[in-house]
Design a protein with these regions (language model features):
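Domain-level signal for Mg2+-assisted phosphodiester chemistry and nucleotide/NA-binding surfaces
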Residues: 1-92, 135
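Nuclease catalytic cores that cleave nucleic-acid phosphodiester bonds
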Residues: 64-190
Length: 190
């Protein structure tokens, strides 16, 4: 069997989906700079998850002809491969790019995947990878993850919370979450 340290964890990031969920669902407004994910922590978490080298693939929609170059340069400095895609207005180019990439990883016959998204559009690719015996995780805000992806936990899909598991934020986000009674501290509510 191949040494797991020779394997690669592909961190496949749906940048639009993470940003939209953070702004529209978690904060209900545009995030302040300190409320955005620390993408270096996200990549470090991917590396540490299964003890393998991690390759970050960050997908952006470039259909408008504009890219946030400061952000792109920062991602590149953190060793992400930034993949700006464009296409017709009616096409979800980032989703198509992510699907094709996950299909290509399946065709490689090796490598594990952490998908940063909440979107059920990737269920077929996740199922294929799970069927091949790959380790697959979704990195997200758990409460906003598609129920179609939650259903795959019993097949081996791991769910990783961006805030609670990865600690990707510098500030605590205003999220309502279920608290295990053993972790409940009434003083934090007083």
């Amino acid at each position: 069997m191949e040494n797991p340290n020779n394997q690669t964890t592909y961190l496949v990031v749906d940048g639009e989906n993470i940003d939209a969920t953070l702004g529209l669902s978690v904060l209900d407004r545009r995030p302040n700079p300190e409320e955005r994910p620390r993408w270096d922590r996200v990549l470090e978490s991917a590396h540490g998850r299964w003890g393998q080298k991690a390759k970050g693939l960050f997908f952006l929609n470039g259909s408008s002809g504009f890219l946030p170059m400061g952000f792109v340069q920062a991602l590149t400095a953190m060793d992400y491969s930034v993949i700006p895609l464009s296409g017709p207005a009616e096409m979800k180019v980032v989703d198509v790019g992510l699907q094709r990439t996950m299909d290509a990883i399946a065709d490689l016959g090796k490598g594990d995947v952490i998908l940063a998204s909440h979107d059920a559009d990737f269920r077929p690719q996740i199922e294929t990878l799970l069927d091949q015996g790959r380790r697959v995780a979704v990195m997200c805000f758990k409460e906003f993850l598609s129920s179609q992806l939650h259903e795959l936990e019993e097949r081996g899909l791991e769910i990783i919370d961006l805030e609670y598991d990865v600690h990707a934020f510098q500030v605590r986000l205003p999220r309502l979450h279920i608290i295990d009674i053993d972790d409940f501290d009434p003083m934090s509510f007083l």
